[in-house]
Amino acid sequence: MALQIHSPCSFSTRPYHLFFTTRNPRFAIKCQNSQIESDTTEDPSRSKNSSSSGVGFGSPASSSSPAKKLSAATSGNKKGKGKREVNRRAPVEKPVFMSEEGAAKAEEQRQNENAFLLTWLGLGIVILIEGIILAASGFLPEELDKLFVKYVYPVFTPSVVLFVAGTTAYGVLKYIQNEKMKGQE
């Protein structure tokens, strides 16, 4: 009694045979909605007018009587290109929020805020330069390294703490100001 084993070498040399199927699936789609079937049997000119109304899906105007639409379309064709009604909106006006005194106060506040932000930008640049100097001091000669460690290192940490605290305070202040403005509107 001999046991026959099929050699897998034909499959291993040609792996594209593993997933190859010769059966082609065929699908048939049938409509089960009687309303769609009745629409296709109706007059094609009537369905063209109702679909070209341009109103949109599910709007009451699209489901209104097609006879009115048909008569309006034919009467419009008889008149030709007549005058059409144009509805114009009023131009958008800028609201007047504050008086001259309020405008001067807002301008002064804007200038103060710009000065503060420029100062804060300068402090950030100083912190960046201090950090680069401290990072590079290990590669410099011993005398410069001692000089930077003596003068720059003690100033670096407090300046970073000041920058973070000031930035946080500025953010909270601006948030409170925005909330007040929203409350006034």
From Swiss-Prot:
Residues 1-46 form a transit peptide. It is found in: Plastid, Chloroplast membrane. Its main location: plastid. The chain crosses the membrane at residues 115-135, 152-172. The keyword Chloroplast applies. The keyword tRNA-binding does not apply. GO terms for cellular component: chloroplast; chloroplast membrane; chloroplast thylakoid; plastid. Residues 83-92 have a biased composition (Basic and acidic residues). Keywords: Chloroplast, Membrane, Plastid, Transit peptide, Transmembrane, Transmembrane helix. Residues 35-105 are annotated as: Disordered. This is Protein LPA2. It comes from Arabidopsis thaliana (Mouse-ear cress). The lineage of its organism: Eukaryota, Viridiplantae, Streptophyta, Embryophyta, Tracheophyta. It is a multi-pass membrane protein. Residues 47-75 have a biased composition (Low complexity). Coiled coil: none annotated.
